């Protein structure tokens, strides 16, 4: 009898202990404060270098991705820096060897490129900008716009230095901070350090490109064909240097802009310039070099990932922020778990890398759209019900992560479109050069682009917009090249190139 009671007592003790333990464990999970930030590939992506506060130092990690300590005489970026107005100085440049930047600060203002061109009397600034844009796209002469021709002549020394700089081999652009921001101030009052970086050289090249193209089109209009090509080749070389390494998406956008503008100008020179075979072959070599750029996926997986995770760490794990009410006492159960948004960020960034790595345009766009649709659905989804014994900080963290990523994660489709448009522009220019070389050799256009292989093209190029061979047809003795949808006979588009009419001694401009 006593033995049976002892056994029952032991059994009930075990059952009650198990129930109490399970309830206690779940109650602790419910009321426990969120864990600290975990340094791991799943959350912070990098585990070193670490800053003194123990958090990943994304800024130092970014600096290791770019070449540094390139001598000024070999650094094409230093040539651009010399021409930028002195509102930016080397004092706020982040560079391992800023000596050449300091020396560039001593260049007299008279030798720098004055931007924008001052409007003549009676002309509004908007009209000046419109005229400059037009003159950068089509041939013109000094008599057409004397004020613009004088301005280009006044800045000829600066433009010559810009063109000479593109022939340097190295590329080490400075990264600058606002004058009131120190590189040791990782968590600023408004923006994290990486998002505060400015790109003065790349930004200047974007604005300088129209000026260089305006001079190129003037040279073409006045018969200086080689001078016109020299300026266009300058932009191709700068774009090539920027895009050779997987930089930020902003830098990549600048490179694609330079490529698209230079490719359009190249087609103008080819069709208006009556070139010889040697110069056409030189154009093709430059165009081929430009097309060989670093994959977009590498940019997303390096600079964009570092920058975004730096921002998320600043938002959710900044140790310098004042302690919030949610971090005090019992309210800690409502505090945010920084690991949740960082893990979500890495998951979506990895999906963006996979999308950019897809082999066809349709697959890339479809994968990119799926990411955007999921982010939008999560952002607008109603808050889910908390499960029994689910920690409150999980609910709070999940809700904040959904809203934040939907607003801040960079869109991929715009970069994909920029890449495809620039690629198509370069391919069309290359094919136009090959067609002109074929015409010089045979006196007539080929029946198909396959006839250009292998003498003038290594293979028939694919259209980046359709993943099929680039469009080509002959009608009434005149050839047409296009990228994308088949154009109408009178369609005007940057991705449509028309050759000379069969009975025309002159070669018409690209529409």
Q: What is each PLM-predicted segment?
A:
Residues 2-511:
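Short acidic linear motifs
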């Amino acid at each position: 009898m006593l033995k049976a009671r002892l056994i029952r007592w032991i059994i009930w003790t075990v059952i009650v202990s198990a129930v109490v333990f399970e309830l206690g464990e779940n109650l602790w999970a419910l009321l426990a404060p969120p864990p600290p930030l975990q340094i791991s590939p799943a959350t912070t992506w990098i585990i070193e270098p670490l800053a003194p506060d123990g958090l990943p130092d994304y800024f130092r990690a970014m600096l290791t991705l770019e070449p540094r300590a390139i001598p000024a005489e070999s650094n094409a970026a230093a040539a651009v820096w010399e021409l930028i107005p002195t509102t930016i100085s080397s004092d706020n440049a982040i560079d391992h060897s800023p000596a050449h930047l300091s020396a560039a600060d001593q260049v007299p203002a008279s030798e720098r490129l004055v931007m924008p061109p001052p409007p003549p009397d009676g002309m509004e600034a908007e009209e000046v900008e419109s005229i400059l844009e037009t003159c950068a796209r089509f041939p013109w002469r000094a008599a057409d716009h004397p004020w613009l021709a004088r301005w280009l002549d006044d800045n000829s020394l600066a433009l010559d230095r810009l063109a000479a700089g593109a022939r340097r081999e190295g590329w080490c652009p400075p990264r600058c901070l606002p004058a009131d921001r120190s590189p040791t101030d990782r968590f600023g009052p408004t923006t994290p350090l990486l998002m505060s970086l400015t790109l003065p050289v790349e930004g200047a090249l974007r604005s300088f490109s129209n000026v260089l193209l305006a001079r190129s089109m003037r040279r073409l209009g006045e018969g200086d064909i080689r001078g016109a090509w020299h300026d266009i080749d300058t932009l191709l070389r700068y774009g090539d240097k920027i895009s050779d390494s997987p930089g930020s998406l902003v830098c990549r956008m600048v490179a694609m802009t330079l490529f698209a503008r230079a490719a359009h100008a190249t087609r103008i020179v080819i069709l208006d310039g009556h070139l010889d075979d040697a110069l056409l072959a030189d154009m093709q070599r430059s165009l081929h070099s430009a097309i060989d750029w670093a994959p977009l996926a590498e940019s997303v997986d390096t600079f964009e990932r570092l920058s975004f995770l730096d921002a998320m760490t600043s938002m959710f794990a900044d140790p310098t922020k004042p302690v919030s009410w949610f971090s005090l006492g019992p309210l800690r159960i409502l505090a945010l778990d920084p690991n949740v948004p960082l893990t979500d960020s890495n998951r979506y960034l990895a999906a963006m890398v996979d999308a950019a790595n897809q082999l066809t345009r349709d697959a890339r766009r479809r994968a990119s759209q799926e990411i955007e649709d999921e982010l939008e659905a999560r952002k607008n989804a109603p808050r889910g019900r908390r499960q029994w014994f689910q920690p409150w900080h999980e609910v709070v963290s999940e809700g904040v992560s959904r809203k934040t990523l939907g607003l801040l994660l960079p869109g991929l489709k715009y970069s994909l479109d920029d890449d495809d448009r620039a690629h198509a522009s370069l391919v069309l220019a290359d094919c136009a050069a090959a067609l002109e070389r074929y015409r010089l050799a045979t006196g007539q256009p080929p029946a198909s682009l396959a006839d250009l292989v292998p003498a003038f093209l290594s293979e028939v190029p694919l259209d980046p917009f359709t993943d099929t061979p680039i469009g080509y047809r002959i009608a009434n003795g005149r050839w047409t090249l296009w990228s994308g949808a088949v154009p109408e006979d009178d369609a005007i588009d940057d991705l449509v190139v028309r050759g000379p009419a069969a009975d025309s001694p002159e070669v018409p401009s690209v529409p």
